[in-house]
Every structure is written in structure tokens, then in C-alpha cells.
């Protein structure tokens, strides 16, 4: 992990939840503006479609072989994403490609855990898994593929755990 990333992770681990939210806003303000030369390019080539937030990432290979990235993201609406990018890009900008390649694959998870949002992410995943499990059970038990309205969740009464 690049030293600046390690420092950021450690910094967030020592903050209260309110302080973390304030720090996210501060980090989000550190993103550089996207230079004019990138603004006229087709953003589809630089969009990150996997992200729910609209993010465009513009790479710039410098004459000395180092990399510099610019990110277009609405930091006001998505301070967590902007802060994550500011920390990540702060570590890899103006560095050789090996620095970016050395970022651990679980960096996002480490960041989310350090920021204190890992549990929220896990909770959202668990809720989605539960909804999908209920939907699959309902589809399997309903002859027409639709569950009757007003029925209890598949597997039991409301609040009970469905068995798979």
C-alpha cells in the first residue's frame, strides 16, 4: 500500500463517525478539476459504468512515463466517492504505473471499512440477498410466477426468517 493510502486509512480509523463524514467532505475537495482538453472528449470512453454515481476517469501518461488521473464526479452529491478518488489518485498521480498496479485488490473494502461504511455496505448486500431469496421462493411456489398480494414473506410470517 502506498504510504499516503496507509496514512489515510489509519487517519479514518481514529475518527468518530461525525469526524469521518467531515473528513470525507474535506478529502472530496482535493480532487483536481478536469483540464479543458479532456472536457470535449466522448465521456463514454472514460465513464465508470459499474459505479452508481456518474464518474469519469481520465488517464494522462506523462512524457516521463508517470501517470496522472483526473476524475469528474459531483463531490457535493457523492462526497464518499470523491473522497475515495482523491485518496486513490493522491497515491498514484505522478508515479510510475507500478505504484497503481501495487494497490491491493481489496483497497475499496479497506477504505469502506476504515471510513466506517463497510457495515452499511454489507447490510445493503444482505438486504438485497434477502429480497432475492424471497423473490426466488415466491417464484418457485407460485404457479403463475406471481405471489398473492398481502401474503407473508416466503418461508413464514413477517419478521420470521425464510428457510432455504
Language-model segments: residues:
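Extended low-complexity intrinsically disordered regions
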Residues: 1-45
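Amphipathic alpha-helical interface surfaces
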Residues: 20, 53, 80-85, 96, ...
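A short catalytic or substrate-binding loop motif that flags glycine-/basic-rich loops and adjacent residues
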Residues: 48-52
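Short beta-strand elements
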Residues: 53-61
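Conserved interaction-surface patches within small, structured recognition/assembly domains
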Residues: 60-78, 89-93
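Glycine-rich phosphate/pyrophosphate-binding loops
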Residues: 94-110
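C-terminal binding/interaction regions
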Residues: 110-140, 161-163
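Intrinsically disordered, low-complexity terminal tails and inter-domain linkers enriched
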Residues: 140-162
Amino acid at each position: 500500500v502506498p504510504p499516503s493510502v496507509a496514512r489515510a486509512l489509519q487517519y479514518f480509523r481514529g475518527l468518530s463517525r461525525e469526524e469521518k463524514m467531515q473528513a470525507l467532505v474535506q478529502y472530496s475537495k482535493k480532487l483536481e478539476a478536469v483540464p479543458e482538453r479532456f472536457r470535449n472528449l466522448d465521456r463514454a470512453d472514460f465513464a465508470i459504468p459499474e459505479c452508481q454515481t456518474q464518474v469519469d476517469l481520465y488517464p494522462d501518461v506523462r512524457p516521463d512515463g508517470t501517470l496522472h488521473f483526473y476524475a469528474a464526479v459531483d463531490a457535493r452529491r457523492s462526497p464518499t466517492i470523491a473522497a475515495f478518488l482523491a485518496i486513490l489518485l493522491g497515491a498514484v498521480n505522478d508515479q510510475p504505473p507500478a505504484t497503481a498496479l501495487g494497490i491491493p485488490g481489496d483497497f475499496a473494502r479497506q477504505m469502506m471499512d476504515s471510513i466506517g461504511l463497510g457495515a452499511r455496505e454489507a447490510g445493503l448486500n444482505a438486504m438485497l440477498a434477502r429480497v432475492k431469496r424471497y423473490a426466488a421462493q415466491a417464484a418457485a411456489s407460485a404457479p403463475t410466477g406471481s405471489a398473492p398480494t398481502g401474503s407473508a414473506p416466503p418461508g413464514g410470517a413477517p419478521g420470521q426468517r425464510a428457510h432455504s
